[in-house]
Amino acid sequence: RMPSGPGHYGASAETPGPRPPLCPASSCCLPTEAMGPRALLVLLMATAWHAQGVPVIQPSGPELVVEPGTTVTLRCVGNGSVEWDGPISPHWNLDLDPPSSILTTNNATFQNTGTYHCTEPGNPRGGNATIHLYVKDPARPWKVLAQEVTVLEGQDALLPCLLTDPALEAGVSLVRVRGRPVLRQTNYSFSPWHGFTIHKAKFIENHVYQCSARVDGRTVTSMGIWLKVQKDISGPATLTLEPAELVRIQGEAAQIVCSASNIDVNFDVSLRHGDTKLTISQQSDFHDNRYQKVLTLNLDHVSFQDAGNYSCTATNAWGNHSASMVFRVVESAYSNLTSEQSLLQEVTVGEKVDLQVKVEAYPGLESFNWTYLGPFSDYQDKLDFVTIKDTYRYTSTLSLPRLKRSESGRYSFLARNAGGQNALTFELTLRYPPEVRVTMTLINGSDTLLCEASGYPQPSVTWVQCRSHTDRCDESAGLVLEDSHSEVLSQVPFYEVIVHSLLAIGTLEHNRTYECRAFNSVGNSSQTFWPISIGAHTPLPDELLFTPVLLTCMSIMALLLLLLLLLLYKYKQKPKYQVRWKIIESYEGNSYTFIDPTQLPYNEKWEFPRNNLQFGKTLGTGAFGKVVEATAFGLGKEDAVLKVAVKMLKSTAHADEKEALMSELKIMSHLGQHENIVNLLGACTHGGPVLVITEYCCYGDLLNFLRRQAEAMLGPSLSVGQDPEAGAGYKNIHLEKKYVRRDSGFSSQGVDTYVEMRPVSTSSSNDSFSEEDLGKEDGRPLELRDLLHFSSQVAQGMAFLASKNCIHRDVAARNVLLTSGRVAKIGDFGLARDIMNDSNYIVKGNARLPVKWMAPESIFDCVYTVQSDVWSYGILLWEIFSLGLNPYPGILVNSKFYKLVKDGYQMAQPAFAPKNIYSIMQACWALEPTRRPTFQQICSLLQKQAQEDRRVPNYTNLPSSSSSRLLRPWQRTPPVAR
């Protein structure tokens, strides 16, 4: 039966389904003395239903809602006696009138809220009737049935807070005490009849919870309900015995600790020495919701009687859990060195061997090392070994990879502790195939061939004679000579065994070849000897006599070789397509280790069918490939039609250039998406050339966009010279056009008047543009806020790259694209750039580099870091606020330029740059990389400048006359070289 007040509560019940419409209190809660014809009709209907054998509750309906203070009567009618179950006492009066039972309360309160069941115990058919009563009290929206709930971990936990008003259900929530939210992983549901159910409660969800509801715009919480989630006690107590092994010298102190813990306090723990149970005082504690019992044996002066087996046992209702250890008592310190390998090792040259020593010592080793003892004094390499310690045992392994002859010899492991020093020595002998050398000598006036064979193991020697001069005697045609004499000349440990074999042949005959063959278990070798004339006692000639034909052939071959080397040099000098972006793997100071992009994974989710691409015009072309506008059908969504840009290589691309494009694809997929990066949309890597599908940027690159705007605002005579073909495409080529300029940016015919700037209205701009809006947006005059937005967006994109440990290495306006809404996106468009004819890329060594955008450490030391990208970003800022001028105007890239950069020269403030923006440029150009700001700091500075810009009128530059000059809304300062 349901309790009538706070108390202990158990696990949850099933929550009911959707409730039917509520029974109005006015029609169901009439006092018994006021029953009229309508009430009698209800009784007749109940009697008809009662005839079917199921108890009936009046009023009918699953729920009843009443106001506080109302008189409520609940009648249950059955075939025989019936019983009520629910929160009855002491809030109800019970009136038994078989076959019915009546519950009445004359002053309903929120305590009457609950579910009432009526059953008929004597009815064999069983059955019951249920009604849920709400007494809606705005001051008490919750009725808590229990203030403590205990469940086992993994069970559902019901927190029994009943809602007194069903109209409040939409605004209920579960919180922890003092309004703290529940844990993110807590999974719970709510039933107004039963309360909140936490599903599969976890041990970490032990908390005091409150039920919360919104009542008249304020939050009202219930009293706290303490949820206790207990670990399931499914076995014996956990047990530890420390140490697992113990060694002591006689007279030293020792300690053995036996510890057991469990959720339930009802368990025992004991410690035994052999069969003897030790009497030790027990320490108890409660930690991390577990009871812990500890037995500690302290021995101040150990003796041999204390040695032996110790066992710790924990016992509870689930059984026993035991652990044991061995305690050894020794007379003095010791160290024992052993090896499971033979101390005499033979290994073939070029192979690897591991020498391993096992040490058991007490006290622990003070020092240990491997030493090479010779005999080859020239072998002084540092030995590479690993030593693993386990209590009183050590395992030391010496690794010798790719053995050379000079590495044979004695290797000794030396270990020292308080007991003294011990050593274990291996003798390593290397096997290698024989080497043969044949010479001619005279012995007792007779021609004799001497064959010297050296190797290990000892080589065997045989002689073979064959007709004619040949490099090797055929086995079938040769004659094996048996009349040879062999003897061991030298046999020293760790050195080769040298064998001499003499072949007495009398007088040498012309047109004969003699071959000495030597072999052992590792391999074989041979050398031939033939005379060039009768009686000539010379060894085999090194080469044949030169002839004019041979000299001619060798001259031609040498000439061809030189030509081949020249072509190879020219090929190496030719620039190749490379990915400028680098991803840092690790760094130490200015020493960076970069990830090999070829080793990055490629996710097949980026794969896109190539027949779903419809190509359009070429956006940009270069020495290595091109970027083409295309329409992608089904990219992202099945029915989507999207304009994209597709990168591809030329058909003549080399394998390394194809690999570079694939690396670029992998880097883009590795970096992920960002609003200010030209994002990867897909790729085609199968069934044809590699295609990289990226976002299409309708305004092309930022450099040409700025130059178009400058010409529109200032006129051709005042603006930057520009490629006449430059439109809204990816025009990253032919940027070497000459244009009239000064240090400040733009030059006219020497007139000193300025173009007046006037405020323009500010209106909200839509971020999405249709095709017909692009021309109108492109024609909108530039404002200061546009330049600030470009700067901020590029900085945000670079901050994103820096957060991904990515270095761009070519930050410039030509590598920034503009899309709808004038959003700037960073990319790398070296594929579609002819760097051979691009004056921005200067030959330095065997590479072409954008030196005017490069930091000093990149120019002089080839060091590329995030800080060097910050320097390049400062140059890009100068490009933006000069409306597309080339950096360092009027300065050629030569030794003078390099000296200026090294000495800290800084360009003057560009014409359209506020003082704060120029200060950012100067900070980016600090000679010391660590003094340059980070991209996050640059973003903050630009946002602050943008906020200041919103507080002053915006200006647009307008040409007033052909004799006008530029005017800015901030103070003009003369160029300063720093």
Swiss-Prot record:
GO terms for molecular function: ATP binding; cytokine binding; growth factor binding; macrophage colony-stimulating factor receptor activity. The active site is at D810 (proton acceptor). Residues 55-134, 141-231, 236-331, 333-431, 434-533 form the Ig-like C2-type domain. Residues 952-978 are annotated as: Disordered. Glycans are attached at N79, N107, N128, N187, N309, N320, N336, N369, N444, N511, N524. The keyword Transmembrane applies. Disulfide bonds join C76-C118, C161-C211, C258-C312, C451-C516. It is found in: Membrane. Residues 613-942 form the Protein kinase domain. One of its GO terms (cellular component) is plasma membrane. GO terms for biological process: cell surface receptor protein tyrosine kinase signaling pathway; positive regulation of cell migration; regulation of MAPK cascade. CDD domains: Ig, IgI_3_CSF-1R. The modification Phosphothreonine is found at T973. Residues 1-543 are extracellular. ATP binds at L619, G620, T621, G622, A623, F624, G625, K626, V627, K647. The chain crosses the membrane at residues 544-568. SUPFAM superfamilies: Immunoglobulin, Protein kinase-like (PK-like). Belongs to the protein kinase superfamily. Tyr protein kinase family. CSF-1/PDGF receptor subfamily. This protein is synthesized as a Gag-Fms polyprotein. Truncated version of the receptor for colony-stimulating factor 1 (CSF-1). This is Tyrosine-protein kinase transforming protein fms. It comes from Feline sarcoma virus (strain McDonough). The lineage of its organism: Viruses, Riboviria, Pararnavirae, Artverviricota, Revtraviricetes.
